[in-house]
Amino acid sequence: MLETNKKYVLNQIKNSDVSNQPWIHLIVKNFLPKDLYDGVKQETEQYTRSEVLEKTNIRAFHIYVNESVNVFPPTPYLKEYYNILLDSDIVNVIKSKLSIEQNHKDFYSELNLFTRGYVYDEIHPDRSDKLITMLHYLADDGDDESLGTMLYPPDKDGTKMDVFKDCVKSAPYISNAVCLFAPKDTKEFKTNHCMANRSDKTFLRKSFQTFWIKEKADWTKDKQSGRVRL
């Protein structure tokens, strides 16, 4: 089954078009086969149903993978999901789409949850130690599609932009959609983006935040201030 599901994901990536606006990124809809996606989503429910998420203005997270320190999920659907993401064919087709030549040396992924009212600290390009960033949206039917990752002009400093007024595009927050990009942070060019939940329609925004990392790193010990670890 792993091989069949891997081929499906590979084809979904291959058949999705890269966008250059406002900077290079790749949106892949229906990223996983339905059975695998449904299983993965079900295995996150012990965290998405946490009592702390009944409050507004909360950001919570649960770490599923940090490859170099041997952190992996114990459940079958999530295991298969991450085996697919770590498969060299999958990694190589993503790199090809995003024009990346460097190889990753580590891999990290967490479940990331925002309740209504939460706005990320600031518009940011992502740290330069990240080779590839992937956001995988776990939206429910009827959720607010505007809750996807917001994208901003690459030639401006994020601290000088408004999270809502200066957004030029947002990835669609729809079930099983993915946004992929290669972080860049130079004086002239920044992959500026941000996340927030100011929706009147959707109380809980759910996604995986996944990173292929340039060097080995233990991110399980990072103290993420202002965020609840589940």
Please provide the spans of the model-predicted regions.
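A short acidic (Asp/Glu
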Residues: 37-40, 120-123, 193
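Non-heme Fe(II)/2-oxoglutarate
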Residues: 4-8, 13-97
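Tight coil/turn sites that cap or link beta-strands
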Residues: 115-118
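Catalytic core of Fe(II)/2-oxoglutarate
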Residues: 113, 123-129, 140-141, 145-230
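A short coil-to-beta-strand element that immediately follows conserved catalytic motifs
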Residues: 99-110
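Short helix-to-loop capping/linker segments positioned immediately adjacent to catalytic or ligand/cofactor-binding
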Residues: 78-81, 100, 120-123
